[in-house]
Each structure stands twice: as structure tokens, then as C-alpha cells.
A protein has these predicted regions:
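A conserved catalytic-loop motif detector
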Residues: 55-61
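Ligand-recognition elements built from short beta-strands and adjacent flexible loops
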Residues: 85, 99, 127-228
Length: 228
């Protein structure tokens, strides 16, 4: 999405998107979930969800929104937020900034909002960066990869399991490719080179035989990385 300016807070953005993907219910946002006694673990206070308005959109419409936003991550501008094995939806944003009533050239707020699992959302992450330096200013290239990193950590913390049925990522020519490192320990230098040269990665070493390797076999690396 490309727009002129940003007129909502991050919390307002998350609240609105949450209503669009949860079946159409607008909830009052809150920061604190519960207060727990440090030593005993006893719950002193717990905040319950408060409905502001129900049926803002129908469940069918909400499902279509989720499906569409999932395709943004697998097929569209949000591919940098894709995580293998997880159904993720999201939307990129690029908003031109205003100064003294005039839209500024080359000065943007770039953002990405992502959620997972796309078919039954449990987590929403929104990130906006004001005028990033030294990089192409698009939400899909700047903000989406950071949201991906946050969601990867959240997946572990929340115990969200992988699931089947999502849309596989469609790679474009400008996407970086990932490879699984082959096991070349025990091979000669010539044998190892013949295997590694089939991938767009760097490799280096000394001697005539491979006695160790880094990263270890089975690791995932991005094109251009070095195997030693």
C-alpha cells in the first residue's frame, strides 16, 4: 500500500486489523494482561477482553481478508515475512511524509503488519520505521524482515506449532534463496567442491581433505554465505 501520511497510532492500527481478521469483533485494546504475585505466582488481577462492537464485518468477509493477506506474504510484497511451516498473513505500507503542508520526496514511513496463524490468528505484530536510511524505502523490504524475526521468537515463546495447508512462498528473481548445507566431512577437497559449487554460496578451506565444516550439515544458509 502507498499512502500520504500516517494518522493512526500503532495500537489503533493493530486494533483495527485485529477486528478485520478475528471474525469482525472490535475489542478494547489493553497493555497489561494480568498482575501476578512474584513469589507465589498467584494472579492478583487479570484483564478480561472487552467488546466495543460486534459484527463490524461478517465472518465470511473476515475469512476472505485473512486469505488475501496470507497471499500477500506468500505471493506478494510481504514475502520477506514468510516463515517455513507457518501460515502468515500481512500487509506492507509505504506512507509519504508531510512537512509544512508539502509531501516530501524520498522521505517515507515504511511499515508492515503481520499475523499468525493466518487461519486462526493468535498473534499480531506491527512495525513502522520513520525514514529509514541507506536502503530502499518500502515496507516489504525494510519492515517485513524485522517483523519476521519478532514472530520467529514469539512462535517459540508462545509454543505455536507448525501446520499444513498454507500457501507456499512464490520466489521472485530478486528474492534471496536459502540452501540446506550438505555434509562434506570425510570428502576430498575436490569432491566437496564439486558438491558446493552447485549452490550460490561461497566456500573456502585449506588442505586436501575435509575434517570439519561450518556451518554444520543440515543448517539453513542464505545465498552468498560462506561454508568453511
Amino acid at each position: 500500500a502507498f499512502g500520504q501520511g500516517v494518522s493512526v497510532t500503532a495500537l489503533q492500527q493493530v486494533t483495527a486489523v485485529s477486528a478485520a481478521i478475528n471474525g469482525g469483533t472490535l475489542y478494547k485494546p489493553y497493555i497489561m494482561k494480568r498482575v501476578v504475585e512474584h513469589e507465589t505466582g498467584q494472579i492478583i488481577k487479570e484483564v478480561k477482553p472487552t467488546v466495543i462492537r460486534d459484527n463490524i464485518i461478517t465472518e465470511d468477509t473476515s475469512e476472505q481478508v485473512r486469505m488475501t493477506l496470507e497471499s500477500v506474504v506468500s505471493l506478494g510484497t510481504g514475502r520477506n515475512a514468510y516463515i517455513d511451516g507457518y501460515r502468515i498473513g500481512g500487509k506492507t505500507g509505504t506512507a509519504q511524509k508531510v512537512n509544512n503542508g508539502v509531501y516530501m520526496q524520498g522521505n517515507y514511513i515504511v511499515s508492515f503488519i503481520g499475523f499468525l496463524p493466518a487461519n486462526d490468528p493468535k498473534l499480531v505484530v506491527y512495525l513502522a520505521i520513520d525514514n529509514p536510511k541507506g536502503i530502499t524505502q518500502y515496507g516489504g523490504t525494510v519492515s517485513a524482515p524485522i517483523v519476521k524475526n519478532i514472530m520467529e521468537d514469539a512462535i517459540v515463546a508462545l509454543g505455536i506449532e507448525k501446520q499444513d495447508g498454507g500457501t507456499e512462498k512464490e520466489y521472485q528473481w530478486y528474492d534471496k534463496k536459502y540452501y540446506t548445507v550438505e555434509n562434506v566431512i570425510g570428502l576430498t577437497k575436490k569432491e566437496a567442491t564439486s558438491i558446493l559449487k552447485n549452490f550460490s554460496i561461497e566456500y573456502s578451506g585449506s588442505g586436501n581433505n575435509v575434517i570439519s565444516q561450518s556451518p554444520e550439515a543440515g543448517s539453513r544458509i542464505v545465498e552468498g554465505e560462506n561454508v568453511r
